[in-house]
């Protein structure tokens, strides 16, 4: 008998991972992406699907802004991780001046 190791649970660098993109409206869109693919591909696909412009929204992972050149591998993303989407604030008062106010 040959001693082949099971492939289960073994991660290779070319693996795809499933990422969820959660909008402020509660919607969740799932994407499958390679670990070394720039996240700009996912971001653009999300915008097209939701009818949004890249200028209108911001993507964050673990509270940190995501750059278009970032990859899941660089951000140490794992399968089923969630990216949060926020509407870009245009005009109005800066967020810092809203601190301490409840609406």
Swiss-Prot record:
GO CC field: cytoplasm; kinetochore; nucleoplasm; nucleus; PML body
Cellular localization per UniProt: Cytoplasm; Nucleus; Nucleus, PML body
Primary location: cytoplasm
Gene Ontology terms, MF aspect: protein tag activity; ubiquitin-like protein ligase binding
InterPro entries: Rad60/SUMO-like_dom (IPR022617), Ubiquitin-like_dom (IPR000626), Ubiquitin-like_domsf (IPR029071)
Pfam families membership: Rad60-SLD (PF11976)
Propeptide segment residues: 93-103
UniProt crosslink position (Glycyl lysine isopeptide (Lys-Gly) (interchain with G-Cter in SUMO)): 11
Tissue spec. comment: Expressed predominantly in liver.
Keywords: Cytoplasm, Isopeptide bond, Nucleus, Ubl conjugation, Ubl conjugation pathway
Chain ranges of the Ubiquitin-like domain: 15-92
Glycyl lysine isopeptide (Lys-Gly) (interchain with G-Cter in SUMO2) crosslink residues: 5, 7, 11
Residues in coiled coil: none
Any Gene Ontology biological process: regulation of protein localization to nucleus
Post-translational modification: Polymeric chains can be formed through Lys-11 cross-linking.
Residues in cross-link Glycyl lysine isopeptide (Gly-Lys) (interchain with K-? in acceptor proteins): 92
Family according to the record: Belongs to the ubiquitin family. SUMO subfamily.
Cited function: Ubiquitin-like protein which can be covalently attached to target lysines either as a monomer or as a lysine-linked polymer. Does not seem to be involved in protein degradation and may function as an antagonist of ubiquitin in the degradation process. Plays a role in a number of cellular processes such as nuclear transport, DNA replication and repair, mitosis and signal transduction. Covalent attachment to its substrates requires prior activation by the E1 complex SAE1-SAE2 and linkage to the E2 enzyme UBE2I, and can be promoted by an E3 ligase such as PIAS1-4, RANBP2 or CBX4.
SUBUNIT field: Covalently attached to a number of proteins. Interacts with BMAL1. Interacts with USP25 (via ts SIM domain); the interaction sumoylates USP25 and inhibits its ubiquitin hydrolyzing activity. Interacts with SAE2 and UBE2I.
Protein name: Small ubiquitin-related modifier 3
UniProt organism field: Homo sapiens
């Amino acid at each position: 008998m040959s001693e082949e190791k099971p492939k289960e649970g073994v991660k290779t660098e070319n693996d795809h991972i499933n990422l969820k993109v959660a909008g402020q409206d509660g919607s969740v869109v799932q994407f499958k992406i390679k670990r070394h693919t720039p996240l700009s591909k996912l971001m653009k696909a999300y915008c097209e699907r939701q009818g949004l412009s890249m200028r209108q929204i911001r993507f964050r992972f673990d509270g940190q802004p995501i750059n278009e050149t970032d990859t899941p591998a660089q951000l140490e993303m794992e399968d089923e991780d969630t990216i949060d989407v926020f509407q870009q604030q245009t005009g109005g008062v800066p967020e810092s001046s809203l601190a301490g106010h409840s609406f």
